[in-house]
């Protein structure tokens, strides 16, 4: 593969590994659709709970139940990102028990080797 091909991207590789990348937008869409579906079904208990609230556990349980069949529509209707492949990543996102500042500091240290940024 030429350097230019690598910079631009390899279309076949991108299509082959499209399910390998879970974006923040995908997680947001999953949570938003979970809320919409639960409201549609008349399940209003803790529907507005934040991810750090205890009530968000009901959202997580609903997502866990549906994850094996859940998908996100990507660039066209024929391409869907199957979320069951990302179960571990989704669980780790939902189990963050820190403030945003603590999470930022942790990521900065992990990826940049930076000292604690307070």
Swiss-Prot record:
Belongs to the baculoviridae LEF-11 family. The gene is LEF-11. It comes from Adoxophyes honmai nucleopolyhedrovirus. The keyword ATP-binding does not apply. Involved in late/very late gene activation. Keywords: Transcription, Transcription regulation. The lineage of its organism: Viruses, Viruses incertae sedis, Naldaviricetes, Lefavirales, Baculoviridae. One of its GO terms (biological process) is regulation of DNA-templated transcription. It comes from the Viruses. The keyword Transcription applies. It holds the Pfam family Baculo_LEF-11. This is Late expression factor 11. InterPro entries: Baculo_LEF-11 (IPR009429).
